[in-house]
Swiss-Prot record:
Keywords: Mitochondrion, Transit peptide. The gene is rrg9. This is Required for respiratory growth protein 9, mitochondrial. It is found in: Mitochondrion. Disulfide bonds: none annotated. The lineage of its organism: Eukaryota, Fungi, Dikarya, Ascomycota, Pezizomycotina. It comes from Aspergillus clavatus (strain ATCC 1007 / CBS 513.65 / DSM 816 / NCTC 3887 / NRRL 1 / QM 1276 / 107). Its main location: mitochondrion. The keyword Cytoplasm does not apply. Residues 89-165 are annotated as: Disordered.
Length: 285
């Protein structure tokens, strides 16, 4: 039993219809092909007909072009139909292509596995072939580690044996005495200094450095230095120092009066901000 090609059966119907319509169309156009010969013999008549029947001439040229192209298209359609009939089924081709792809993947995977195995073998052979190098490297690292602490210990000993400067010794002593940090010393008046010395000379067991430090709100080290010092100012220096402290007292008193914490006084009035900004008449300077 003969096999029927589905593609050829689908393509035969339009080709037959095209051939039928083409034959009818060419039969109608055959008597109208005379102007083509008149173009060479009678140019005046051709120009007259072209002006009169311009649309008819354009349709004629289009029909001629269609007629020249149609045999080529019909021939190509017939060739396509024959090719479709002669080719195998698509399912078989897909199966073959899938089989080829699977075979190629299998070969690629086996090749990759073989390359990995060869690389591992090379690595293993390299590591086995060079145990001496590994041993030497480990020995060198051990020696460097053992020598490191020795070098640091020697450097620390050299630094400790080196003679220290006086300012370094004093700095370390101050750090030990002032563990909470170095704070600026509190300014004590000459009367306070004299009072500290007098109290300590009268009752040294009762007025110790720690007690005096709590009383005058300074560090015990500052009290020890005050008691230890043997320097005494002269009469002129004492008078100058006393005047300076009196001015400081009046200035602080004027600031307290502006805040409302102290009563007004004539001595502190000259240090007030109002006295600095305005004169006695109340005008701004």
């Amino acid at each position: 039993m003969s096999n029927i090609c589905v593609a050829s059966s689908k393509l035969n119907l339009p080709t037959l219809l095209r051939s039928v319509f083409r034959s009818e169309f060419t039969a109608e156009l055959r008597p109208q092909q005379e102007p083509k010969s008149l173009f060479l013999t009678r140019p005046t008549l051709f120009t007259y007909r072209r002006v009169r029947d311009g649309r008819h001439f354009s349709s004629l040229t289009r029909s001629l072009e269609f007629q020249s192209r149609s045999p080529v298209s019909s021939h190509s359609s017939l060739l396509v139909a024959t090719d479709v009939c002669s080719t195998p089924q698509p399912s078989e081709s897909v199966k073959l292509s899938n089989d080829q792809v699977s075979v190629s993947h299998a070969t690629d995977s086996t090749g990759a596995i073989s390359t990995r195995q060869s690389a591992n073998n090379k690595k293993g052979s390299g590591t086995r072939a060079t145990p001496d190098l590994m041993a030497t490297e480990s020995d060198s690292s051990k020696t460097s580690r053992s020598q490191g602490p020795r070098v640091s210990a020697l450097s620390s000993l050299a630094k400790s044996n080196k003679k220290r400067e006086t300012w370094q010794i004093q700095k370390d002593a101050l750090k030990k005495k002032f563990k909470e940090g170095w704070n600026p010393p509190k300014k004590l008046s000459p009367d306070a200094l004299d009072g500290i010395r007098h109290l300590h000379s009268v009752a040294p067991d009762r007025f110790t450095a720690s007690v005096l430090a709590e009383q005058f709100q300074v560090s015990p080290e500052a009290i020890r230095r005050i008691l230890k010092s043997k320097w005494r100012p002269s009469a002129e220096e004492m008078e100058e120092r006393r005047e300076r402290w009196d001015r400081r007292h009046d200035r602080i008193w004027s600031q307290m009066t502006e805040l409302g914490l102290r009563p007004k006084s004539r001595r502190a009035n000259q240090y007030s901000d109002a006295k600095v900004l305005y004169d006695d008449s109340g005008k701004q300077e």
